[in-house]
């Protein structure tokens, strides 16, 4: 007898090692089943991930195999942890099981299966598999079932107690030992009852272990409350378990519908299998065999038990031991497990105890995984799909249709070299005698290769002109190909930008050598070197996959495609942009190829012709988009063709390196065919390399006929051969991609174009082609699809260097016509980066629709929204027919030129309306026709029924004509459920609110949207509130009236009736509540006075005295829910304020909001006052009807967008289409892919007109005859004048230069100082902690500024250094001098600088005893700035600071704040740090909470070498440390606070000894670090701010650890710290950017704050006097002219709206402009000014706003 057990835990081994071993074994031939399991599971997981909401999908990295996720994705954390734990707990044991070498035979009478938790589901995979071969598919479906179960549990957890996507996980399960099930259950029942816990949120038992231990489950917050308040259970031994996924084993939360949902997507062929003879699987709930005749019944039963039953392993053991027929007296019982398990040990013991004669032993089936003997990896192969392509080819073939037209017409487009390349007459000599000339004037050329849309690609005209046109055209064609492919960044798994590669072939640099090289400028390198061609594409599109530039001469582009296929097959990328580039601009290559007798003297390539005399050079740019076939099909891409095989070899046996070799070529074809599994006779067309050289053509025809059409056996079907070079020349590096594009067009058009250039007779060296059934098409040959036979094309591309590459293409798979989708109204979008392109794109789309008015509207909408990259200029229309769309688009043509660009995504608000306009059947159409919305409503309905409420579905699915009485209770419940579902729908579409507000009933949905209440809590509260109203209030005795009048007008007009103000929605939008009689009278009175009124269809007068009977019972119910911290700001109409945290809600908030007046208008006013919302905020109204649009517009003047979610008077599709149009037009990033996902398989990506570029000619003309002369005359050199001597560096802290280097790229200096030196040690001695010297971190400021000044003097000699800022400081360890000063103790300081000294990163390191290794102490960055501009900036709020300082002193005078003297300050400080007298600058201080001000007088410096003396910087700033370490607001018993760093330290004036300063700071808890505090320290001299330390941050440290952390390195603790550097201080959090930096380099530092500190040399500089000219002044005109000159843009084109990035101002050009402004306009700007100043308008504003400080 064999018992197989599957555990609910991972094996005790190293899990990462197990996954690694599974990967290795899966590649071995003897583990084919294991490999298939992983492949099938990967496919299933991908399918399920595709169905996840976008916010969850975005958490997952790209993966090629499920093992990639297991190894690289942290699935133990985050919201999907439970879901993927389900996946891997099923996958791991099954993989171990199928890998074992035993026979796969399990009979019912000899085999028994058991399992716990997810292991129970894993066991079903084996029980449901009739054979080993069936296991992979079965396992995949069990993993699907497990994943859906995990997702179901996650969804339920979110409904009950949601967690943020990046929040810490909390346990849902605790174990209680020593009490027993009965006692624990009594404690649980008592708690649930006494706290009125809603049933779905109740605490329950999930597991009872054999030893009596009990697992208790529940929402984490309630579980904590239970153990802190529940009497007996509280005192029992208990502990949380690592169960984070959510609630399971919960019969009150799940039923059979949930287990059916988990199983329903499994494949029918698996579910229908018969299990009548399968082995038994014992229930983990009671030990009884599961009764299942089919796999469907087995899966549903197992899932139901998992979701609803308590696990009782003891009952399973009892059931086994009680099965006497199974355990005969002398039977050998084999218990087979997958790695050791204590649970099984208990089973074996129980069997041996109950059946002493039974021999039971345990077998580990997983041991095989550790046997590495037979590991021998092999690879896999998948077809590669071409899904997009574009080209620029000779003869005007600037797009695919023009190319096809050229081919069909059989045109030969060779011509003389055009004048824009070079002077063909002077550079051509047909005799070949003249030096460096070509013997042919002919070539094939792209028209105007300089045309480029520089603004689209964020390049200046200057940069564009200096950039090789091949690079520019590569950008254009790459975009066009991507657009044709429907690429949208990160839309799907295979379009994740980090997984997209760029690979291009290129073999010449004509433009660099002959054009740009004539006058080398700043963009010469990035604009022309080959690596920048694919690199520029990757950079622009933000692709992070492999980027290669390939040069294999003439075969470069097809070699690039082959490498791209390999990259995809190996899983190194999921999508690749590939192609070839060749633009001929210089005569050198013409001359060289002529001398080598490659080129034809007579014209184009005479392919196959007996008179062929060489090839004709040609331009060519081609780009294609590649994906694996499975990914392309998954993404609903259009497949243009399939690459079945690709290979490259080398003709090493040829007679010379440039000579072809037919046998090698033939071997290549065979290899490619074998790889693809295709017979040679199935290939109907070979697109040959066919250059028109005698040797090349003869060798290729020999190899082709030998393989594809030998004499014996003769082909039955004709083989056709052709070569595109006869049309457009030999594109060299672009030749292969040109041939490939031609082949794909042949598939598309189902015909073969004629071959041209057979001027004389067929090449006499060819065999008899007719006899071999080989044909050269001389006319258009139809080549339609044939049923049962696929079409194949072989594409050849050979290299003059000997390389040969071939691709085998298969026709694209046929696809049925689109079926459309149930939507009745669709959004169509057009966008561009310029108004010129916008108009042209609009015209192009209109032309397309007029030519094909029967195009599928749904597919048109899908293509223009979900399958397009959207730009800042947008036209958005919606309609129900193509005719309506055309009409709307035509109306937009006239206004397109005035369209405003979207500068940034707007803030988004959700407004949740009340109940006032409820009607039955709300959202019925959306429910019936849009599955995601239906799923959400059904999920919420389950919550309703779990609370004991009636189902909401009848009220939603009923029609208005149906006779269905909707109770007030149901109306409220439906309303809030619809709002929650709509909120989730909008969020799934990428519409994430920044702020939410709800009116009346809508506030409950707003609390859900803000994250403070769960969906379950909201439904429970609304349902209970509605129940109380029905029970305690009289229906229809009171009513409500909406009035368009002010409160004053109403009071003046209505004097004889009793009423209350229920809602004040706007200045003239008020809702009254009163009895029905009074409401009727009031209505008549107001109407008679001309006021607009509307009586609301509500059964109660909400927010009035009618509701008072429910308040106290409802308040008790409301206290049973838990308010969580908000994730989104909430505007509270009750509080008339904005709420940012849950502490702002008073205990009676829900009670008060039920009765209190809805102060909607005041709340919205408050939100505007604090800047949270404005007229640009985009609002989405979420409710059963559009009722709050008027109120929003009344409260926010000039509000632009309020988009409703539903309207009762129109189709749901119409409402949503209009709203989505408005949102998209406003710049909201809608997830259109998610919107169309349910219907995507029924839609098609349309081949619409491509993007219409705003082209301008950017071209450097080649001039002169210097290429002919090649002048090599030597030039005399010159001596550089010696650089001025740098200033001396020796100071107390900076000792000697260890190394330095300076050059054109900047400089580096390394300083080494001895800490035990007397001067250095004296600095440390003035600042002691735990009685030990510790160098003040503010000493680093002096070091930084001294080194920065030195570097500035070396790099910018003769240029005055104005002011410096030392910022981005992060302190990792303290610098503590040794006790033993007999030996040196070194510290090293490294500083780097760019050539402009705009950023000078510094890192400080302790040198270890071996003097080889170092430990990092701190990092920071010095930047240069303008002290006068800081002074002006600070002046704007000086009065606020002085007012606050005076207020603090008044509080101290009143005894409300603490005033402390100097002596007391430093007495208090001694508990943490003991300052020497010269550090004791604070004379007195006032502390109030976390706020303080100190009077400071600085001690004089004895040493004149200081730049920023630490005994000045420390006392002027340590008021923040005083608050935290000595202030009354903090508990100092167990914690001290030490310096973490600061973001910026700058002073406009030098600090002077003896002067009185005031330091003010308010410390606050740091947002991103628990326990940290930060604040801005302001330093005032008089009433003027002269310094600021921004975001000075202190971190907590347990006081008990002071001795350890501040012991000298040569003490016991200090030596331990040196051995373990990471413990020198508590580790800096991972997410602090500077803390990640191991070596401070310019590229690693954040340069967003280029600010500085004043130095003594410039502190007295006076600003320029006089008024500053306005924006039309000569200076502004000079500034515009300078920018125009440097960018190459016409001055008139630099309008106020022009963005600097759009004209190519990048980091490099920004530095150039800053330097030019300083030199030519005498204006000093920060190095990143033009990166941080968006446009010309902002530049003008800056010039005007800084008129007194610019110089």
Swiss-Prot record:
It comes from the Eukaryota. Its EC number is 2.3.1.-. Pathway: Secondary metabolite biosynthesis. GO terms for molecular function: 3-oxoacyl-[acyl-carrier-protein] synthase activity; fatty acid synthase activity. Residues 1610-1670 are annotated as: Disordered. The lineage of its organism: Eukaryota, Fungi, Dikarya, Ascomycota, Pezizomycotina. Multidomain protein; including a starter unit:ACP transacylase (SAT) that selects the starter unit; a ketosynthase (KS) that catalyzes repeated decarboxylative condensation to elongate the polyketide backbone; a malonyl-CoA:ACP transacylase (MAT) that selects and transfers the extender unit malonyl-CoA; a product template (PT) domain that controls the immediate cyclization regioselectivity of the reactive polyketide backbone; and an acyl-carrier protein (ACP) that serves as the tether of the growing and completed polyketide via its phosphopantetheinyl arm. The keyword Oxidoreductase does not apply. It is an enzyme of class 2 (transferase). The modification O-(pantetheine 4'-phosphoryl)serine is found at residue 1707. The active site is at 554 (for beta-ketoacyl synthase activity), 689 (for beta-ketoacyl synthase activity), 730 (for beta-ketoacyl synthase activity), 1327 (proton acceptor), 1514 (proton donor). It comes from Aspergillus flavus (strain ATCC 200026 / FGSC A1120 / IAM 13836 / NRRL 3357 / JCM 12722 / SRRC 167). Non-reducing polyketide synthase (NRPKS); part of the gene cluster that mediates the biosynthesis of aflavarin, a bicoumarin that exhibits anti-insectan activity against the fungivorous beetle C.hemipterus. Catalyzes the formation of the aromatic polyketide from acetyl coenzyme A and seven malonyl coenzyme A molecules. This is Non-reducing polyketide synthase afvB. Residues 1295-1603 form the PKS/mFAS DH domain. Residues 19-249 are annotated as: N-terminal acylcarrier protein transacylase domain (SAT). Expressed mainly in sclerotia, with expression levels 20-fold and 10-fold greater than the expression levels of this gene found in mycelium and conidia, respectively. Residues 1295-1429 are annotated as: N-terminal hotdog fold. Residues 1456-1603 are annotated as: C-terminal hotdog fold.
